[in-house]
């Protein structure tokens, strides 16, 4: 019989559910949030692969969990977006470095951090409008994440590279981001939800207009971390593993300095 069988009376292995998180962070945006650190083209086999090199800042921790695609809490490990940003090869992103840095700075040992990956590579901000698949999935996953009593502490948002090629998209970015934040806060009933967005480091065309909108957004409880100058891979678009670690630490510092 395929798949084997369980003898009558034989105990099924017990699955230990982790203690649910009490501090929850949403990770959203496009590919640099999903993580492409360490992803390279294997020309021999003509496919993209992750090198599986894991910096110590990104090491797993039993007190850092992630919400899987099927809405279960499990111990977090890279790639955080493996079952979320599907159809692509994910590698190291900023999430684990961020979570470890925050965990190390918190004064209580009882803190359990929950990461909710929602990013999707190659997406423009108009694809995150209320009613879209990506927006509604993010809201659903966020709502699910707090059913066990955890508190949504912040949204980390890294997106914009797909909005630099068209002048209209670039000039509309600020208004679109403003609307996204207001919609998300309203739909989650969290009017003061902290948002930490990343000013993009790469992309051609009208990148300066998108960055200007990101750095100049004037909303309460919104801060911006600038990724400009962080090391890029040979594609001049995605952050290296080292850069993702640096970004994660910068995001943690922004959170701890502004919202703790």
Swiss-Prot record:
Please give the superkingdom of this protein's source. Eukaryota
* Keyword hit for Hydrolase: yes
Q: Where is this region: Disordered?
A: 1-22
Supply the EC number(s).
3.1.-.-
- Pull one GO CC term from this UniProt entry: cytosol
Show the GO MF annotations.
hydrolase activity
- Asked if the record carries the keyword Transcription regulation, the reply is no
InterPro entries membership = Carb_Esterase_6, SASA, SGNH_hydro_sf
Q: Which residues constitute the catalytic centre?
A: 31, 235, 238
Keyword list, A-Z: Hydrolase
Please report which protein family the annotation says this sequence is part of.
Belongs to the carbohydrate esterase 6 family.
Please give the name of this protein: Probable carbohydrate esterase At4g34215
Lineage of producing organism: Eukaryota, Viridiplantae, Streptophyta, Embryophyta, Tracheophyta
């Amino acid at each position: 019989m395929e798949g084997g069988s369980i003898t009558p009376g034989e105990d099924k292995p017990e699955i230990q559910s982790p203690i649910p998180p009490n501090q929850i962070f949403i990770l959203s945006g496009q590919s640099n949030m999903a993580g492409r650190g360490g992803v390279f083209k294997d020309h021999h086999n003509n496919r993209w692969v992750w090198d599986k090199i894991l910096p110590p800042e990104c090491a797993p921790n039993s007190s850092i969990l992630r919400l899987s695609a099927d809405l279960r809490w499990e111990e977090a490990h890279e790639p955080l977006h493996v079952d979320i940003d599907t159809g692509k090869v994910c590698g190291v992103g900023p999430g684990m470095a961020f979570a470890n840095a925050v965990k190390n700075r918190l004064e209580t040992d009882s803190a359990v951090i929950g990461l909710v990956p929602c990013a999707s590579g190659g997406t423009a901000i108009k694809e995150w409008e209320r009613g879209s698949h990506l927006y509604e999935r993010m809201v659903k996953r966020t709502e699910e994440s707090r059913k066990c009593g955890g508190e949504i502490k912040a949204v980390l948002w890294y997106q914009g590279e797909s909005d630099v090629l068209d002048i209209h998209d670039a000039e509309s970015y600020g208004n679109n981001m403003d609307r996204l934040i207001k919609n998300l806060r309203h739909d989650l009933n969290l009017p003061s939800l902290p948002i930490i967005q990343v000013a993009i480091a790469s992309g051609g065309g009208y990148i300066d207009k998108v960055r200007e909108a990101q750095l100049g957004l004037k909303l309460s409880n919104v801060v911006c971390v600038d990724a400009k100058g962080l090391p890029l891979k040979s594609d001049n678009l995605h952050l290296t593993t080292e850069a993702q670690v640096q970004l994660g630490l910068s995001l943690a510092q922004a959170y701890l300095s502004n919202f703790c």
